[in-house]
């Protein structure tokens, strides 16, 4: 895996990309995720929560694009390590540290 985005600059949300970005997703997309989970809890009909699900997807894809623009090399290195080691955080701490230094959690 050479990049976390395709040729047009759109994020490719693979498991390695999502795992590497999980802390950032949790921070930035919390309101959208909470609204979606509340909707799912209150109404078991999946159709009722599609708009909230789209909000979560939009937030995550926007975040991934922002992260890739801000810290492309570090993100690609971290994602590549996670991909190579099947999402084992312990084996990618060096890449994680470099990624979080350039793209800190806010």
Swiss-Prot record:
Its main location: mitochondrion. A motif (Cx10C motif) lies at residues 92-103. One of its GO terms (biological process) is mitochondrial electron transport, NADH to ubiquinone. Residues 26-67, 68-106 form the CHCH domain. A motif (Cx9C motif 3) lies at residues 71-81. The keyword Repeat applies. Disulfide bonds join 29-59, 39-49, 71-103, 81-92. A motif (Cx9C motif 1) lies at residues 29-39. It is found in: Mitochondrion; Mitochondrion intermembrane space. PROSITE patterns: CHCH. Keywords: Acetylation, Disulfide bond, Electron transport, Mitochondrion, Repeat, Respiratory chain, Transport. Contains four C-X9-C motifs that are predicted to form a helix-coil-helix structure, permitting the formation of intramolecular disulfide bonds. Complex I is composed of at least 49 different subunits. Belongs to the complex I NDUFA8 subunit family. Accessory subunit of the mitochondrial membrane respiratory chain NADH dehydrogenase (Complex I), that is believed not to be involved in catalysis. Complex I functions in the transfer of electrons from NADH to the respiratory chain. The immediate electron acceptor for the enzyme is believed to be ubiquinone. This is NADH dehydrogenase [ubiquinone] 1 alpha subcomplex subunit 8-B. The lineage of its organism: Eukaryota, Viridiplantae, Streptophyta, Embryophyta, Tracheophyta.
């Amino acid at each position: 895996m050479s990049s976390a985005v395709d040729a047009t600059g759109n994020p490719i949300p693979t498991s390695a990309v999502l795992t590497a970005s999980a802390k950032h997703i949790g921070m930035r997309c919390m309101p959208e995720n909470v609204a979606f989970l509340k909707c799912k809890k209150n109404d078991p009909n999946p159709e009722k929560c599609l708009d909230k699900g789209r909000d979560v997807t939009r937030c995550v894809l926007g975040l991934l694009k922002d992260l890739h623009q801000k810290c492309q090399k570090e993100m690609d290195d971290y994602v590549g390590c996670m991909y190579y080691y099947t999402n084992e955080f312990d084996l990618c701490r060096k890449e994680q540290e470099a990624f979080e230094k350039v793209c800190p959690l806010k």
